[in-house]
């Protein structure tokens, strides 16, 4: 019989839950007061692509600031301040340039997903008024998740944070994850 040196594997049974990696969860918030129009992502669980439009948004403040920018002398302090406010409120540089080229303010702006992922929380409905800072969506990247396991005290010496594990989920196909 051949003898070989190998790492001893000791199975540990524990109950736990799968949770989102908190470093891969992104909040999408309203940056300015306004109304939700054309809600495109309608429920938690929906997959989204990075830069996909989640909803379209109408804001009197955005509209007024666009008009300020169009009326201001190009390159002046007023134009620079208006352009910066529009960027801070979520209007893309491309949309600002396009609005200036057309010399017509955009009635609505799109709010895009910051990542490719899954909507894990949707807090907005079509037609709703939202205030600056209000949470609209929470989106998670499912490419890496956490397993939060409740390990018995006698098994603690055999477990380390960040250790690679094989997880079997009861009720699933029985294949390890």
Where are these regions (language model features)?
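Periplasmic scaffold and linker elements that assemble and bridge Gram-negative envelope complexes
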Residues: 1-177
